[in-house]
């Protein structure tokens, strides 16, 4: 037997029924005061801590809570506030905090981008002229709160300095170490205050260590953690890595810290191999992330116990910590909120609370022997076996189709240069055609009507009539705005992935399986539990109805395979590429159905392509090849004059531009303005031969852009892209915006377009 310690790395903020989201939005809308917001969120925070305490977790994280984002929290802790928000130098107010994230009328929001290869977004620190000072030791506040209110000796959580700075802007390589030197004393101040308050452990997250970087950068970590060790020698620092294995295992495990946290789930087996090859320091704790913190499937506890037993051979007794692979921020709170799910599927699930149970079971099995948890191990064994062997997971027809993929065409009949002429001939669009990305605002009335329908309070006919009425209203609005290529608005959809999951075999929706995407925005990823198959037309009815209302082209709107995969909880018993190809074959039938019914512009969105890239560049090629294949599997069977669009967002594209071209979409639209136009520089350096729309205003902020701002974005883009290739559109879908600001922004977009179009037409003459 091995004496082990149980730990957690972070807990979902949303609450079991999204109470956190509702509290934030009530505050933003002026429905509650700041004091009421603080009271509501404190109650949620303490409830989460108490739950972990009751489940027997030894090291409970504190300070993982946030009002928006943990990286933004780090920025305001150290006073890294962009000048445009006119911060006075004191503690950052809650209003200023939210302004940085959401923008205000006279100051654009800070950039937002994906947290490594997840669907969580962080607010990018703006580090130019950074002069860090501790303005607000949030970690200390949350540590003392947990101790006072619940008697919990918590483990404060900080974003590590190297990772924080690497995630920022204005951190040029030449001056990076000098910038880091400015932050070390500020971090030391935080740690000293925690030590004085009685903290025994601090978790410092450095996921940058799990990426690919030059070995010379290890010296940055040596400098930081030596400074910390010297300043707070009695504080046990857990240096936490996750999402991948460590390229420089030997160097990392010998850094001057008390514990090293390693991901044994998303590491492709590399972590165990490194442990066997190089051993582990006798004086350190090894925090083994063995429970998957990014997926929702129940663990094979026999296999996990075997893995932990193997790991324990290399760790000093009493220094093995059992924990999830990463923060549980990325999974829903509890499966107990899903009593209506199929029994076999429910049995095979493990949300955040159940993962804590799994950690407690494994810790007890190690410490007291497997016989002490015989019933728990047998229950897990039976549940996993039942799901794997069930008809839910095994569709022989789908498996046969996958086996015969070699007979399926995955290239368009004509090359782009030839088919685009056929598309131009019938579309007859003006220079700089305008469109939107797909969704329009889902008003309280839309959400209430859908909720009433789902509860059975209104009939299918009443619901469909409402959707048609809303669609018709927005078709008319688009025509009045003079948009060139229209969309139906997606009023029937809650989410661009969940909706497809409700229509395809092999998927299962949840009621309360919500996870945070950005700010108060929560998504409810579907469960891909089995083989995926097309069973019915998904989008045809709404698209055909919208097209019947106008002579302008209306885009069919689908979500592409890789995004469906990345924004779902995917079965873990087969390779993801197999699931992506199953989705591709199913969507191919939907694309063909749209085309048969007269929809000749079809958008297949792949916004999550970039975010899903493996953290190790050595694994990129296979991922990208698989992504291109599944996309072309979806789209390649259409006629030459059918125009395929795709959309991507929140991404750096300079290193995957060849992949984007290989998708062979006729038109691609890309988020641009939230990254403050940086993507345009990519197109200044490469020749892109297909048509492209670079988003000309940020939809993630309620702020309405000016005509001048939009024109500046258009003109900047036109320095890099041929005018005849260029489309004009917002950054992303408009579902989360309010109607007045949406219409005002689109009016400005169309006005800006027409003025620039007129300038170019004069130049052409």
Swiss-Prot record:
Swiss-Prot/TrEMBL catalytic activity: 5-methyltetrahydropteroyltri-L-glutamate + L-homocysteine = tetrahydropteroyltri-L-glutamate + L-methionine
Enzyme class: transferase
Cofactors demanded by this protein: Zn(2+)
Name of the protein: 5-methyltetrahydropteroyltriglutamate--homocysteine methyltransferase
Role of this protein: Catalyzes the transfer of a methyl group from 5-methyltetrahydrofolate to homocysteine resulting in methionine formation.
Organism: Listeria monocytogenes serovar 1/2a (strain ATCC BAA-679 / EGD-e)
Domain of life: Bacteria
GO terms (BP aspect): methionine biosynthetic process; methylation
Cofactor: binding comment: Binds 1 zinc ion per subunit.
Gene3D superfamilies (alphabetical): 3.20.20.210
Entry keyword Membrane: no
Binding residues for L-methionine: 437-439, 490, 605
Record-linked PANTHER family: 5-METHYLTETRAHYDROPTEROYLTRIGLUTAMATE--HOMOCYSTEINE METHYLTRANSFERASE
Keyword Cytoplasm: no
Biological or metabolic pathway of the protein: Amino-acid biosynthesis; L-methionine biosynthesis via de novo pathway; L-methionine from L-homocysteine (MetE route): step 1/1
Binding of Zn(2+), residues: 647, 649, 671, 732
EC annotation from Swiss-Prot or TrEMBL: 2.1.1.14
Protein family: Belongs to the vitamin-B12 independent methionine synthase family.
Active-site residues annotated for this sequence: 700 (proton donor)
Binding residue positions for L-homocysteine: 437-439, 490, 605
Membrane-spanning segments: none
Any one GO molecular function term: zinc ion binding
Residues holding 5-methyltetrahydropteroyltri-L-glutamate: 18-21, 114, 567, 611
Keywords attached to this entry: Amino-acid biosynthesis, Metal-binding, Methionine biosynthesis, Methyltransferase, Repeat, Transferase, Zinc
